[in-house]
Curated annotation (Swiss-Prot):
Keywords: Chloroplast, Electron transport, Membrane, Photosynthesis, Plastid, Thylakoid, Transmembrane, Transmembrane helix, Transport
Transmembrane feature ranges: 5-25
Quaternary assembly: The 4 large subunits of the cytochrome b6-f complex are cytochrome b6, subunit IV (17 kDa polypeptide, PetD), cytochrome f and the Rieske protein, while the 4 small subunits are PetG, PetL, PetM and PetN. The complex functions as a dimer.
Identification of the protein by name: Cytochrome b6-f complex subunit 5
């Protein structure tokens, strides 16, 4: 009964972590762009 709960938590966390990484990478890219200008 614990495995479905764990799989649900993992499936819920993966998109959140991916979104967080994408946002941080995008912010760093924009910051580098501004520094280059």
């Amino acid at each position: 009964m614990v495995e479905p709960l764990l799989s649900g938590i993992v499936l819920g966390l993966i998109p959140i972590t991916l979104a967080g990484l994408f946002v941080t990478a995008y912010l760093q890219y924009r910051r580098g762009d501004q520094l280059d200008l």
